[in-house]
Amino acid sequence: MLPEAVAAMTKLLSEPGNPSSLHASGRRARRAVEESRERVARAVGCGSAEVVFTAGGTEANNIAVKGIAWDQRSKDPRRIRVVAGSTEHHAVLDPVRWLGESEGFEVTWIKSDNEGRITPDALREALGDDPTDVGLVSVILANNEVGTINDIAALTAVTREFGIRFHTDAVQAPAWLDLNFSELGVCAMSISGHKVGGPHGIGALIISRDCHVTPLIHGGGQERDVRSGTLDAPAIVGFATALEISAERRAETVARVGALRDDLVTRVMQIAPEAIFTGAKKDRLANNAHFVFPGCLGDSLLMLLDAQGVECSVGSACNAGVPQPSHVRLAMGADDDAARSTLRFSLGSTTSQSDIDKLIEVLPSAIERAKRAGVPKLTTAPVRA
């Protein structure tokens, strides 16, 4: 967390109060919440009334995907289809699947290109000749695995022709991109605190005033009757503080971290020429470096590097202890083995040159050992969008 966010949050933790209460401590907490709401709104280019606080990006995505789909179907029974990108984060992927499996919706996945990008032409293909049955389109703004940035404004220009609601998962974006909700053309956008140096367990769903959402949680309706539950005022203040500071420092951070990322990519390719740098080359998050290391299981590399003090990620989940291929890489056209041989290095505002040097020092031996271990055959079918 950013030190400023820790300080702001700690101060309010010592002054407890329920923002929904009318007594003095409640009014003090409510003032902190509403001031934070205004700060969040300024940082992402929306009105303060459009900010609905949630318990994080996953809840925000679930509220948007399920709530908008339900609302649109209730108003027009023809709208029984949900269209989403094949490279979505599981916080969108899984709710969309659930709507299809449990709620009777039809699901269409938008094809990705080989850089992880969702294009307007691919969206038109997914919508089909008669998109009057589509209640919602959801496409991630910046991919969490490979860092590719989608042109959301170009995509909403397509859905606007048919009056289709559009949601975007923008959780990865605020620290690295100039985000303006009013210019994207979406009706809902999800963001999260811990991605900007704020606390875990807090986020927001930005919802346009004309967008109606059927709530998931009932019991108080504290947030526009969209989300119920006592608000976590300290976390909200920490979130707003971090978001505000990250926006103020964005240009400098992007330039510095982007240079470190480019150095990392160049040096990795020098010591491992067989490695493949994946994702978009230009329209990409400045902090993201994603590779395929042929012949190496991504999970093996992760553990070997972790033992040397280097923390990184793979784009896979483990099912019963069996590493699964990255659904993002599969959607980009990779085969099963390549999709299990991925590794993502995510840089942050505190990443230094010495961190890059450390990685380059220990990576060759990790690759050598991972190659000796090999890539075991899958024993279960890979999960695809």
PLM region spans:
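Pyridoxal 5′-phosphate
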Residues: M1-A385
